[in-house]
Amino acid sequence: MVKFPALTHYWPLIRFLVPLGITNIAIDFGEQALNRGIAAVKEDAVEMLASYGLAYSLMKFFAGPMSDFKNVGLVFVNSKRDRAKAVLCMVVAGAIAAVFHTLIAYSDLGYYIINKLHHVDESVGSKTRRAFLYLAAFPFMDAMAWTHAGILLKHKYSFLVGCASISDVIAQVVFVAILLHSHLECREPLLIPILSLYMGALVRCTTLCLGYYRNIHDIIPDRSGPELGGDATIRKMLSFWWPLALILATQRISRPIVNLFVSRDLGGSSAATEAVAILTATYPVGHMPYGWLTEIRAVYPAFDKNNPSNKLANTNNTVTSAHIKKFTFVCMALSLTLCFVMFWTPNVSEKILIDIIGVDFAFAELCVIPLRIFSFFPVPVTVRAHLTGWLMTLKKTFVLAPSSVLRIIVLITSLVVLPYLGVHGATLGVGSLLAGFVGESTMVALAACYVYRKQKKKMENESATEGEDSAMTDMPPAEEVTDIVEMREENE
């Protein structure tokens, strides 16, 4: 067997990240396959797709940030007691989400948000609210799965996490195919995608929970000792989580904002419809070569030796901070190479769109320029992911909150200003998204510099204090000095 000594320190990082990257790409493919399966319903297919899509997007926007509790499990859960606190947080959050779903389904608030704000007719609106009610339990299942995924990632079981997510996608596709041949197609077609979604989540949650109990539950202590940083409090967990949740919420709302401004810029004409369609087609394709880079933020908390919570999980860890930085740079270079090969090589991007999305060649040609803009996304995404992971290790996520605000400000500013420079349509949308990413990454970099300077100053002060203490310790006690003087006088 051929060995590469130079890669010895990088194999753990590769084994950790590859399953997560494959999972990220598989989810993109899975959503496309699920939508194609839903569209196979014979009656009211378009209306059902619209109702389910609207309900699903609302559910992901309001409850999606709970998926960032994966990072709470990754950073904070060092004992059975810590896990119990994390699970309690998710039970409460799931209950709040269920109440919110019920209010949207039955109150005037739901009618305003769905019917009025989205300008849909009564039939689509009622089906959307019903679908939203059916999805009430999904955020809880999703959050429970992600919490245990974070705990498994801390102990380097990324392959198991990847298998669970891929099993989720496979279960969704399989159950759509099964339910399409059942009586649900006639009685309640909305339940076909929703039940498939629940079955996929059940498979993922069960896999992750069983993986936790089999591999981790018996090896972690009942309580965290001082060497592991002590027991985490619910307040610390929530303080760590909310900036990450805010960032995810702004990411989820960015695309609807882009669609709205692009459509309004073209006056709601057929060109506007075409531009939004191009954005819809190009986003999953453009996202594939760089989307997996966001998983890099889990590397620092999982491998950094300076993180006290890794002492239990990383008994044989040979990975240093320098290795993580080099590995991150190589990942960025690989993603950039993929982007330029896929989107700048003649006819390659068109073929991908025709084969995967199913568009015609004329439409695919219109997507070329937006896809080429996606080629530059890996740089800001890598910077953001790497520095976010470092800040997560230090539990300083609160400094990330301004980056989400700046992203929205830069995004909207670009959408308003660029049309005056002659940029319109899908190019306007993707260009503004890139500007938002750059703005967000810049703010994250500034926040990281601020934290780094504070950490450096703190270490210098501690070193100075230790130096003074050691100097005081080296001086002999006053009684010993007196005895020495008396002995000299006697000798004289």
Swiss-Prot record:
Bilayer-spanning residue ranges: 86-106, 132-152, 159-179, 190-210, 327-347, 351-371, 404-426, 430-452
Catalytic activity: ATP(in) = ATP(out); citrate(in) = citrate(out)
Keyword Cytoplasm annotated: no
Pfam family, one: ANKH
GO biological process: ATP export; bone mineralization; calcium ion homeostasis; cementum mineralization; diphosphate metabolic process; gene expression; inhibition of non-skeletal tissue mineralization; inorganic diphosphate transport
Any Gene Ontology CC annotation: membrane
Family: Belongs to the ANKH family.
Protein purpose: Transports adenosine triphosphate (ATP) and possibly other nucleoside triphosphates (NTPs) from cytosol to the extracellular space. Mainly regulates their levels locally in peripheral tissues while playing a minor systemic role. Prevents abnormal ectopic mineralization of the joints by regulating the extracellular levels of the calcification inhibitor inorganic pyrophosphate (PPi), which originates from the conversion of extracellular NTPs to NMPs and PPis by ENPP1. Regulates the release of the TCA cycle intermediates to the extracellular space, in particular citrate, succinate and malate.
Protein name: Mineralization regulator ANKH
The organism of origin for this protein: Rattus norvegicus
Higher taxonomy: Eukaryota, Metazoa, Chordata, Craniata, Vertebrata
Gene: Ankh
